[in-house]
């Protein structure tokens, strides 16, 4: 059975499916691949460069904020409620932690976040500034990720609990692209 999407391409970008309540601020700073779905109630704040690969799904109630760059590779997904922070106040010591006070009283840590190709981030997970999620890694629901994650690992928070089958996954992607007649490199260069 074929799934039907009731989407609006309110941003008029080929290969991007958005919905009525998708909110993207700074869309001119975003580079899109193809075959991307960004659900209702997603909020993306693109003050700096954001790159979203091809065949990426960003589920409802996800937010990407913080004022620094973010990338997510091909065939990756952010499940419902994921929070990507590329910037965060330092709540330790004597700093005030909110944007209503002058910058001189705050200590904001900003750093790019990178999620590699073939990754999955589980529902309600939090990825903090400066984190790189290696190619093929998956993060369990409800995780808080504060450190870089190695490729092809299965993680609960920062703790590795297993390995994914890299060869099988890459074979599946190759078969998908062959069966559908898609060429990932060409679609990413558009």
Annotate each predicted stretch with a short phrase.
Residues 2-6, 116-121, 139, 184:
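Hydrophobic transmembrane signal anchors and adjacent membrane-proximal interface regions, especially
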Residues 16-17, 95-98, 138-144, 175-190:
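Short, highly charged low-complexity linear segments
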Residues 20, 25-32, 37-127, 158-168:
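Flexible, glycine/small-residue-enriched loop-and-beta-strand segment within the central core
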Residues 1-35, 181-190:
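Extended, small-residue-rich solenoid/repeat segments and analogous flexible loops
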């Amino acid at each position: 059975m074929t799934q039907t999407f009731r989407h609006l391409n309110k941003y008029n970008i080929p290969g991007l499916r958005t919905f009525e309540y998708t909110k993207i601020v700074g869309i001119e700073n975003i580079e899109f691949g193809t075959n991307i779905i960004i659900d209702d109630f997603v909020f993306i704040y693109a003050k700096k460069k954001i790159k979203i690969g091809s065949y990426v799904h960003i589920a409802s109630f996800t937010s990407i904020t913080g004022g620094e760059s973010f990338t997510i590779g091909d065939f990756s997904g952010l499940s419902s409620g994921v929070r990507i922070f590329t910037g965060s106040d330092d709540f330790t010591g004597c700093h005030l932690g909110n944007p209503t006070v002058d910058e001189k009283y705050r200590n904001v840590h900003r750093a790019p976040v990178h999620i590699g190709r073939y990754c999955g981030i589980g529902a309600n997970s939090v990825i903090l500034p400066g984190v790189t999620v290696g190619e093929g890694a998956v993060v369990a629901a409800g995780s808080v990720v504060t450190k870089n994650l190695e490729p092809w690992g299965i993680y609960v928070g920062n703790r590795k609990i297993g390995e994914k089958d890299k060869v099988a996954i890459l074979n599946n992607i190759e078969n998908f692209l062959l069966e559908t007649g898609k060429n990932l490199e060409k679609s990413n260069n558009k």
